Amino acid sequence: MAAIENVISSAIVRSYTEKLLNHLEVDVAMVGAGPSALVAAFYLAKAGKKVAVFERKLAPGGGTWGGGMLFNEVVVQSDATAILDDLGITYKEIETAPGYFTLDSVEMASALIYGAVHAGAKIFNAMSVEDIIFKGEKVGGLVVNWTPVERLGMHVDPLTVVAKAVLDGTGHPSEIMNLAVNKAQIKLDTPTGKILGERPMWVDSGEASTIENTKEYFPGLFACGMSANNCMGGYRMGPIFGGMLMSGKKVAGLIQASLEK
């Protein structure tokens, strides 16, 4: 047998290379591994779709981990508890507010990540998206590079991931939508054709609009969670996550329907 040092390194390089090669062409390429996109990845992978999620940071989970101001608890309303049940996440009803529940944000983040991966989605962490593939009438994939390359400003050409559908799950900045508007001159399905911008906090409105604004904004290009709210000028809602989870489930259904046309 080869030296164990060589066995370890060879196995890692071989396994990762196979994983990446198998996901250079996918059904759905997602950008950002926050709660909404992870829910979408979970349901789409369960439905048999080939899903790759690209996350800039080392740790997926988005803004879930820290709860509210580092108090690692979050709130979810009753409309979203079925999603928690699907993922095996525990929750406790708030005695003074029936229909609202607290849950451990670390458990939720961990369960979302595990659920998506266990269902068959692949998460590529420490990988940034610097551009989209655009062929005039449809968004057709992503242009990716290592996050350290991006942050160090190294002159290294990227690689591409071809996809039938692209999901912007980048949260408040709507990074992929911004690329689409500013670089590809795409006109989004918004009142102005551009990104309207997120408004201040209004919990009730923000929760409702997060779900309402989740949709296909251009052929092949979808947005969920706070990215969708930013596109349509919705309000933010803080550490209540029902809307985010339901947005992820909604966009999974929309993408699945689009793929099966």
Positions of PLM-derived features:
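Extreme N-terminal leader/targeting segments of oxidoreductases
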Residues: 1-27, 194, 199-203, 222, ...
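Feature captures the FAD/FMN-dependent oxidoreductase FAD-binding
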Residues: 88-165
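Flavin (primarily FAD) binding-site architecture
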Residues: 168-183
